[in-house]
UniProtKB/Swiss-Prot annotation:
This is GDNF family receptor alpha-3. It is found in: Cell membrane. Residues 375-400 form a propeptide. Residues 1-31 form the signal peptide. The keyword 4Fe-4S does not apply. Glycans are attached at N95, N148, N309. It is a lipid-anchor; GPI-anchor. Its main location: membrane. The keyword tRNA-binding does not apply. Belongs to the GDNFR family. Widely expressed in adult and fetus which exhibit a similar pattern. Essentially not expressed in the central nervous system, but highly expressed in several sensory and sympathetic ganglia of the peripheral nervous system. Moderate expression in many non-neuronal tissues, particularly those of the digestive and urogenital systems, but high expression in stomach and appendix. Several types of glandular tissues show low expression. Very low or no expression detected in the hematopoietic system. InterPro entries: GDNF/GAS1 (IPR016017), GDNF_alpha (IPR037193), GDNF_rcpt (IPR003438), GDNF_rcpt_A3 (IPR003505). It comes from Homo sapiens (Human). Disulfide bonds join C51-C57, C162-C218, C169-C175, C186-C196, C191-C239, C220-C227, C248-C316, C255-C261, C272-C288, C281-C340, C318-C328.
Length: 400
């Protein structure tokens, strides 16, 4: 009878090396698809399914859902009124996975995810309005933007950069298709504004970020009004913006009634928020720009105010605000006098100028280097130590 071999215990040195190995993250590689629900740390859709499996959680969520549908969304200046039974339902959800769940702007079923987020938002705060809590989780990608500037030789050498970025979009099948879709929806004497906005939202959500940013944030010479006009007309303002400027507070109230618009506005205020009078910004410029572009196609669509500068503003007014005049001007100024947004736009335009300058010989590498300025996509400092630990471990295990 053959006795089974008992596995020999690992020596202490091997166990120590195993403990030294850090957990390996799984960043999105160059060819990976857009983030899906499964890639999110705590998707609200997944959290909702977990809640449905628990009778107590499911009942509390349904009750809270009926509360949020019957209670109007409070504005920042208003004190929310929450019935006691709704507060009790919110309290029952505070230990569930729904608290802290997130969404992603490019995920499937995004609106359904945001509906869940804003339903449990009351449970997060127990009735206190939290304007600065973005429902979006940032997903880092390492995909570089590859482009061939030699294809622009068909343009005149002195063509403005907005025309060059428009050509780059035309040469890209996906960007060209999405741009034509909103161009058709937003043109004509009798355009349907809601259709135009929906196609604009689709473009800035699905087009590659460098293409979208290049089209909208292309730099122009100070005296080049034609370039400035092309840039300002990128979002087809004659159709996308309201013909008569509404009151800014009414525009915000309309935005808050839509989960998607509300989410984009909160995301913008989260990532473009000046922290102090010195203009210290809450997050890095790339996130501010991403949040800014996320507003295009919503009720809060901003745009450049003229053809001669890069100032942006909402298409609204503070006339008729009464006692809320100061609050209205603060909302308006968050776009027109926001140092974080202004500097983020200026920095991106400087980068776009460098892409086409003669002393920038490797455009593909330049884009990758610029993306790596974001600390979230830099190589992790433990990568060399991971290799140095793994090689001795393999050798020891082979000898053992």
């Amino acid at each position: 009878m053959v006795r089974p071999l008992n596995p020999r215990p690992l020596p202490p040195v091997v166990l120590m090396l195993l403990l030294l190995l850090p957990p390996s993250p799984l960043p999105l590689a160059a060819g990976d698809p857009l983030p899906t629900e499964s890639r999110l740390m705590n998707s609200c859709l997944q959290a909702r399914r977990k809640c449905q499996a628990d009778p107590t959680c499911s009942a509390a969520y349904h009750h809270l859902d009926s509360c949020t549908s019957s209670i109007s969304t409070p504005l920042p200046s208003e004190e929310p009124s929450v019935p006691a039974d709704c507060l009790e339902a919110a309290q029952q959800l505070r230990n569930s996975s729904l608290i802290g769940c997130m969404c992603h702007r490019r995920m499937k079923n995004q609106v359904a995810c945001l509906d869940i987020y804003w339903t449990v938002h009351r449970a997060r705060s127990l009735g206190n309005y939290e304007l600065d809590v973005s429902p979006y989780e940032d997903t880092v990608t390492s995909k570089p933007w590859k482009m061939n500037l030699s294809k622009l030789n068909m343009l005149k050498p002195d063509s403005d950069l907005c025309l060059k970025f428009a050509m780059l979009c035309t040469l890209n099948d996906k960007c060209d298709r999405l741009r034509k879709a909103y161009g058709e929806a937003c043109s004509g004497p009798h355009c349907q504004r809601h259709v135009c906005l929906r196609q604009l939202l689709t473009f800035f959500e699905k087009a590659a970020e460098p293409h979208a940013q290049g089209l909208l944030l292309c730099p122009c010479a100070p005296n080049d009004r034609g370039c400035g006009e092309r840039r300002r007309n990128t979002i087809a303002p004659n159709c996308a913006l309201p013909p008569v400027a509404p009151n800014c507070l009414e525009l915000r109230r309309l935005c808050f009634s839509d989960p998607l618009c509300r989410s984009r506005l909160v995301d913008f205020q989260t990532h473009c928020h000046p922290m102090d009078i010195l203009g210290t910004c809450a997050t890095e410029q790339s996130r501010c720009l991403r949040a800014y572009l996320g507003l295009i196609g919503t009720a809060m669509t901003p745009n450049f105010v003229s053809n001669v500068n890069t100032s942006v503003a909402l298409s609204c007014t503070c006339r008729g605000s009464g006692n809320l005049q100061e609050e209205c001007e603060m909302l308006e100024g968050f776009f027109s006098h926001n140092p974080c947004l202004t500097e983020a736009i200026a920095a991106k335009m400087r980068f776009h100028s460098q892409l086409f300058s003669q002393d920038w010989p490797h455009p593909t590498f330049a884009v990758m280097a610029h993306q790596n300025e974001n600390p979230a996509v830099r190589p992790q400092p433990w990568v060399p130590s991971l290799f140095s630990c793994t090689l001795p471990l393999i050798l020891l295990l082979s000898l053992w």
